Structure formats: structure tokens, C-alpha cells
Amino acid sequence: MAALFKPGVLTTDGKALLAKWQAGGTAPQITHAAIGSGSYTKTEDASTRTSLKAEKLRVGISSATADGDTLNLRFVFSNDNVTTGFSVTEVGVFAKDPDKGEVLYSISVSADESVADFFPAYSGNHSVSSIFVYYIKTSNAENVTILGG
């Protein structure tokens, strides 16, 4: 069975940053994504998070394309440096805030941790990669800057 994630939500910091972008004071700068194994209750409000609960891997953006006011971000996570496997239950996208530095912009958490994807440790023989595609609305943004990757 495939992992099920709740729709991504903007965090409190993400909403504040979006307001800055929309006001035209700064161009959006997406920096990276992270996956983790944090546990969330069904009613927990993930939008109040400032970080993942249990971050395990962090990667730059592999590719990005724009489709109107939607930014399609592709992240490729590899287990090459993973020594202990884990269940992927949270995904976060980070952005650069001109006043606060790097912030957790958006987060998506597992809808059902019993069917979360397992990210294995590197066996020494075979690498495993997992691709995440994340869609972000960038309404009113004239330019979007993608950092890293």
C-alpha cells in the first residue's frame, strides 16, 4: 500500500513569508526539502511547526518548473548516507525569509502512519532513492528564486 499524506499546509512562518512575497518586498526563495519520521495525531495542527519533529534527510531541489502560478518542485532523497532505516511520516519545504533566515515554509504529514513508506538504510550494495514532487502556489510573485539543488 502506498503512503498517504495529508495535503501540504503553509506554516505560520510560511504564511508570513507569503505575505512578504505578495507585497513585493522580496522574491520567493525556496532552499531545500527535508523528510522525517515524526509522529502526529490526527487532529494536530502541523501549520504551527517551525521544524520537522524528527528530520532524517535534507536535500536541495533537483528540478523546478513553473506552471502558471504553481511551482512544481522535485526532490530526490537517497539512502547513501542513511545508517538506520525509518518510516517517512513528514515532508517539509524550507524557504529563505529576509528577516528570519531559513524557515519551514510548508509541511505535509502522514495521513496514516501504518502505511508510511519505509526508507531503508544503505546496504552497501544498492542505493534507494525516493522522489517527492511538491506543488506550491506563488500567486502575485513576479519572480521565484530556487536555491541549491
PLM region descriptions:
Residues M1-G148:
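N-terminal assembly/attachment segments of tailed bacteriophage virion structural proteins
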